[in-house]
Amino acid sequence: MIELFLAGALLLSSPQTPAPPVSQDPLQLEDVVVSGRTLDSLIEDFVGEVAEPNRNRGLARWHDSICVGVANLDGEIAQYLSDRISTVATDMGLRAGAPGCTPNILVIATADAGGLARQLTEERRRAFRMGGAGMDRGGSALRDFVEADRPVRWWQMSMPVDSETGDPAVRIPGRCTGDCIDAADMAPQIYIHSASRLSTQIVDNLIRTIVIVDVDEVGGLSALQLADYIAMVSLAQIDPDADTSNYASILNVFEAPEISDSLTDWDKAYLDGLYAAERNHVGERADRSEIADSIRRSHDRLREEEVAEEPVAD
């Protein structure tokens, strides 16, 4: 259990009250035996609950590499969390930063999560809101990040970029190009290579995730459960208020830790779909459709494996 490792945290955790049992067993992906529109509805409901893109933007993902930093935890557990999150990222086709890299996923443990969130957002406001259109979830969501009582809270920044060049596609206060003399130097320069109403050069890349872990509320989890939960909310834009209680997902780990020891098939299929999606389609619905297709493919594969393992009748 992870509490065995927390002795080196900035402040120690306290004993936890066991979570109440869930009213019904969450749905395992391979157990979905319905077909047609019903299966599609289950998948679409899961994606709809989980996905939380920035306003008027598509779903963002990391483009090339991630670097995980862990603060205020004992070296052994800190290294484990970093390694496990990096492993999940590499499974998605990303590169993990070498030792000494500058973290773009920062995990901070504390016994006063709300206080730390408030301090960081007040003292380093620009790290949370850079001012570019579509780069974060907005002021109301930031207040929720500070004020809501959650075992793990997270804040992400993403950047709309030109997929051809990687250059920012939005104006960012304080940044400019050229001589920085007139208004044109303050605006992004996008050269359209092929105009289309169905495709776009502008895609959304995650550029920063800040995760705050309340050590008083995670003592009942295994190190793997905590690491995979953080990986899920760091590698994708996840709605912190998502109700996934009807599905077997790592996102339910605080309400029902016995349901999953690690990322589930629902979670893996969601991430697989996000990172395999063709992102030049116009509209958020296209992103969600590709994720839903990934989950359906995983369901079909799992059902085939289950059938293959069934004993053959004499």
Regions found by a protein language model. Give the residues of each.
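Hydrophobic beta-strand segments of well-ordered beta-sheets in folded domains
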Residues: 30-31, 62-68, 209
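Long, folded non-catalytic interaction modules
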Residues: 69-84, 89, 93-311
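Sec-dependent signal peptide recognition
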Residues: 1-8
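Short coil/turn linker and secondary-structure boundary residues
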Residues: 2, 37-38
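Compositionally biased P/S/T/G-rich terminal and signal peptide-adjacent segments
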Residues: 38-62
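N-terminal secretion/transport leader regions
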Residues: 28-37
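Cleaved targeting-peptide boundary
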Residues: 11-28
